Structures are given as structure tokens and as C-alpha cells.
Amino acid sequence: MKTTTSTISNLINNSLLRCAFIIMPFVLMCVATLPGARAVSPPPDGGYPGGNTAEGTDALLSLSSGTNNTAIGADALANNVSGNDNTAVGFQALLLATGNHNTAVGSEALFFDTGGHDNTATGFQALLNNTTGIENVASGAFALINNQTGDFNTATGTGALQANIGGDANTATGTAALSDNTSGINNTANGVNALFLILLATTTPPTG
């Protein structure tokens, strides 16, 4: 009797195992086809063709042929169509940008940049109004905020060179350093409020 019972038990167990092996693939297939289990398109990492990466509402919204751009934040690089090698991190950073090789980190940094290239802006509204200026570096909130066409400027500190519009090759280090300079060139100011009241200064020697 024991042998018969054991044999029956073995047969039942083997049958259950075989059923499990047959049913399991179907179960997995059903789970995989559930809406929540499907892959997200685009993928969560925001990778797109051409080496572009976008994360955030309308980030890189207008992109067509540009390559190697990174946009993180709502509206970051939203207007970029064909610009290459730009990096925007922050709300509306590089929003209107169409140029190349620009880096903006901070809300509205390089917001109006349309033709400038090789600019670096770090901080809230740094280089906000830059349109065609090139190779500028702004680090700090409002640094070079009003620069439009000036080139080769370096501003480090909150409000440094904030009034500069078309001046070139200026260096300001410190809060509000050279903050009233609008079109002067080749100035260097180090320290808080350094050269605060300068309006126009050049390296051109006086004549006469």
C-alpha cells in the first residue's frame, strides 16, 4: 500500500511540475503586455538620436538637426533647431538659443542667446540678455545679465559686470565688480564693488 501511495504522489507531483513549466511562460507573457510593464518611449533617460539628451517639459522641443545637445529642465533649449554641443540645465536655460557650444546652468541663464557661441553662464539669469556675444564667462546670479554683443568678458560674482552691453575683454571678480560698465573694454576689477562707477574706460592712451 505504501508503494502504491508513494507512486501516486510522485505522479501527481511530476504532473504539477510539468503544468507549472507550461503555464509559467504564458503568465510572464501576460504580465509583460500589461500597460504598466511596457517600455516607455522615449526611454526614461531621455536619449535621442544624434547624441541629444532631453529631460523636462518641452526641453529641446524644436530640435531638428542639432547634435550632442543636453537639455535638463522645462523649456531648456526649447528653441534650438540646429545648434550643436550646447548644454542647458535649469528652467528656460538657453531657451532661444540657436548657436553652438554654449553652456548654461541656472534658471534663465543665456535666455535670449540667439547667435552667440562658446559662452558659459552659471547662475540665475547669468548672461540673460546675451544675443550675439561670444566666448563670455559669467558665474553668479545676474552676472553679465545685460550683455548683448560684448565678447571675451569674464564675470565672477553676483551682479558682476551686470550693466555691460557691448564692452569687450573685461574681467570682473567679486560681487558687483564693474557693475556699471556698459561699453568699456579691457578693464580688470577685483573685489566687491570694484570699479563700481566706471562707465567707459579703455586701454587707449590719451592723446594731445
Language model regions located:
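Glycine- and small/polar-enriched repetitive beta-structure motifs of secreted/surface proteins
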Residues: M1-G208
